[in-house]
Amino acid sequence: MNKSILTKREKQVFEQLIINKTTKDIAHLLSISEKTVRNHISNVMQKLGVKGRAGAVVELLRLNEISL
């Protein structure tokens, strides 16, 4: 079984980002603070060694961690 590099919550955040949800939208949807959403995004960017949300999305798609 392949283990995801993303936590369940990180995956939920990025699944919303790829459908163009804002940080505020994601926070409301997941019942977490906007700061927590930004932390999840930042953590994923650090794990992947990329700069920016778009770079993280591209890399996660390439790794089949998320899908469109």
Predicted features, each with a name:
Residues M1-E34:
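Helix-turn-helix DNA-binding segment
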Residues R9, H40-N43:
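Residues within the DNA-recognition helix of helix-turn-helix
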Residues K11-E15, M45, V57:
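Hydrophobic residues on short alpha-helical segments
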Residues K24, S42, A54:
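Residues within the helices of the helix-turn-helix
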Residues Q46-L68:
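Basic, Lys/Arg-enriched C-terminal extension of HTH/homeodomain DNA-binding domains
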